[in-house]
Amino acid sequence: MSKNKYKITELEEILRMKQMTLKSHLEAKLEAAGYEPSSEDGFLYAKGTFPVLLVAHMDTVHKDCVQKIKYTGAIMSSPQGIGGDDRCGIYAILQIIKDFKCSVLFTEDEEIGCVGAEKFAVSDYIVNNDINYIIEIDRRGTNDCVFYSCDNPDFEEFI
């Protein structure tokens, strides 16, 4: 099996999970990557050694989980909706932390009002942290990426 096929299989696995099953799955993935994750009501957080917090949400706008995935060239689709918002962000974070031990935040119920993000924002985790930058990996509409505040000179120097 090619390396790329393995990665697509990992993404497919993430796309098929319900939010709470995914939360348990991600907790195990973080532990396997050397983190000590904290599973709280509304979010899953793991402190890293790199001063960046990577954020994605575990819910999707779609009611049903992906059951069948269709491939048309490099495009994935599903009758249930692919769940790319924000399962692709989760997948991207899992790839990034293989090389950089960033802090990680996976939130619940973003699509119904940022419930998990609000709970994290008032938690002790955000107060007792050495985070210089927060990068939320999410999407909006049909574009590949959305960028906000990319003209920060300090961030540009950091990267």
Describe each PLM feature range.
Residues E13-F50:
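A non-catalytic alpha/beta surface segment that caps or lines the substrate-entry region
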Residues V61, I82, D86-I159:
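Acidic/histidine-rich catalytic neighborhood of metal-dependent amide-processing enzymes
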Residues K7, K18-K29, G116, V127, ...:
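General structural feature for long, well-ordered alpha-helical segments within catalytic domains
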